[in-house]
Amino acid sequence: AVAEDFSGDAEAGAGVFLQCQTCHVVKDGEGNLLAGAAGMVGPNLYGIAGQPAGSVENFGRYSPAMMAAKDQGLVWTEENLVAYIASPNAFLADFIGDTGIRGSMPIGAPNEAAAANVAAFIASLD
């Protein structure tokens, strides 16, 4: 599984994910809620590890910045997920090469360790 390749602490990431559930859920293909509450502002995060950015089915509110990153080949590797979760706008601006671009995710994790833990948690739910 992809999760086994992630270096963060998934258990610690579950606690950090509580901040993410305002906007995100993790629901499997059968609709079972694995994490989160009712947040649907952002995409369902189930199965995103290892997938192209901006590719969650039935989610049509990706920012132009995220779609530009998708068009440039962004894949949610551990490294990319951690960097994005830590600082979403800085990551997208750097990836796209446009310092003026902004995504929809307003804030990131408190630090890189927390971001790594959240990434590991999300990947562990696949």
Regions found by a protein language model. Give the residues of each.
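Periplasmic/extracellular electron-transfer cofactor-ligation site
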Residues: 6-10, 14-74, 88-99, 124-126
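C-terminal capping alpha-helices of c-type cytochrome domains
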Residues: 74-126
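Boundary at the C-terminal end of the N-terminal hydrophobic targeting segment
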Residues: 1-5
